[in-house]
């Protein structure tokens, strides 16, 4: 690439200075300031883009035009441009006749969206035989401009070198290489060659001059070496020709100015029929890419490489589209970054879909606005790349939003289920339906809102996952509610069978188990009906109902066995046996308590009551109803995870084993023997009472002592005092406390006396002999018998 060269706005009469040190003329405004884009050392300036922005054309898009002038040195090219477009190019000092324009300069037309290039003249004495720059500048001008103004004098028409026909031949060859195939496929690439014939005096009509130039151009075209596939192409397929004549600038100054203004109108008036800037001539390079495009062309020209303008346009398009895409993407990333943290934090962002659509639309709109002017293929590819990057940035936000919606809706569903299942009267199916519809509706609305237009994203798959989790949660809730319902039914069943079981076990009878099992079956049937009634709203399957009923039956049986085991524990069953024995031994058939007399047959009554009571032990030992239809058959298996098999189901009717029965029998026998001994003692006490005659003997023998007390004043006074004291103590209720105090004092006196005697005689403390109650009772029974 050519070395940088800054803006050069030097005056005509100042010596030439390299562009790097030339300041902008203070007499030029920013909109008409000129810039040397290529200096005489063939270096391209890096400041063209900045100058285009100063001209106010950077954002013009395609609403601009480029025109270049081509011709011999000192033919008034700069003057013509200044008159036509209001530019500020340096013009020649006619008194010195030296080169004015060096390199290529550019200036914006006054009040026009036109960038005008003033190209160094050909055939100048300064360059002499060096035609390299002439060819390169002609090639550069043709590749860059829409209209190439060929400036020549009238007397040069018909000449070959004087009319620059040799250079035009080079231009034609270059143009054929540049636009041959492109024009053949029907796309743009045409250029207008505007021949401005200067110093026209009118003797030779313009039409004749036009015919001469046209013939010369066609002859040159025919002499070109064309590729085989382009040999039939005509000059008119690539170039449009236009001709105009201007009178002498000095000899006919007024007419010259009027003709120039008329020619200017053809550049300005778009409504004019002979308007020169036709759309077909435009190179379709956006204004903001002109500097980069021209620099690329000049670099190719400088290195003598084959100049492929379509490739240059694509390279420019790639460069500019990448720049535009980067700017749009930077702002887009800043916008997306603001919502990244909330989404990653698990929060559902309200209106995220609208924001993402807005961000994406803004980025694409910004890209389309600035990049759509460039090469369509490159623009389309870069747009697709931009869309892919935008979507890859938004996709995590979209998926995160769906994930957060999923969690939120699942939490809402659980809450709705728990709230709906409170209370007594609820329909599980309705609660589940309302909660599910609400959660799915919320997720669907959020998923639709989060969807970005123009993408192939979908939220239906996530909705299916949510539905699966909702079903799993609902199944767990249904299982929990079913378990709660079974537990409640079980508690009610226990409550209803508790009292009847206690009642029937307390009054043992041969049909005791029939009554207990009948009550149990009735209660269990009611419990099963209650379950089936409530289970309808749970949408339970037949298998689930069967399993639940089996579990309920097993739980009911376990509850019954637990109650029976409670009522047949050792202390309780022995109490029942004692009560049964007492009712038959201590009471007669009418329920009157018996008072045993020596002549009563205690032994027979005892044996009868004992045998009847012992007959109850086998009755209590096994649940065995007389009516076999009342026997309860447990389910073979149960899926109830809340019950444990604490006993063997095959032996569950057995309450007492044979060993247990023998143990209970022995314990009861000992209790019964105690009752028998007690009865025998009561008869012995009645036999050993004091005879009545003893009381008469006591009166006779104690009469004198009684008289002594009664007739002795002292003794009688003490007797009265003792009687009065006893009466007062009895009236005040102090008899018991007095006896208690007396016993306490006596015990304390006895303890201290015993301790003193032990200390005195050093006698050891002897333990009381162990007395065995039952054996002693048996000895006493033997003695009595």
Swiss-Prot record:
Highest classification ranks of the organism: Eukaryota, Fungi, Dikarya, Basidiomycota, Agaricomycotina
Function recorded in the entry: Cooperates with the reticulon proteins and tubule-shaping DP1 family proteins to generate and maintain the structure of the tubular endoplasmic reticulum network. Has GTPase activity, which is required for its function in ER organization.
UniProt keyword annotations, A-Z: Coiled coil, Endoplasmic reticulum, GTP-binding, Hydrolase, Membrane, Nucleotide-binding, Transmembrane, Transmembrane helix
Cleavable signal peptide: none
Binding-site residues for GTP, renumbered to this chain: 71-78
Organism: Laccaria bicolor (strain S238N-H82 / ATCC MYA-4686)
Example of a GO MF term: GTP binding
Region of interest (Disordered), ranges: 1-31
Cytoplasmic side: 1-689, 735-785
Membership in a protein family: Belongs to the TRAFAC class dynamin-like GTPase superfamily. GB1/RHD3 GTPase family. RHD3 subfamily.
GO CC terms: endoplasmic reticulum membrane
Pfam families on file: RHD3_GTPase, Sey1_3HB
Low complexity: compositionally biased ranges: 22-31
Protein name (database record): Protein SEY1
Residues in GB1/RHD3-type G domain copies: 61-281
Top-level taxonomic group: Eukaryota
Annotated coiled-coil segments of the chain: 458-482
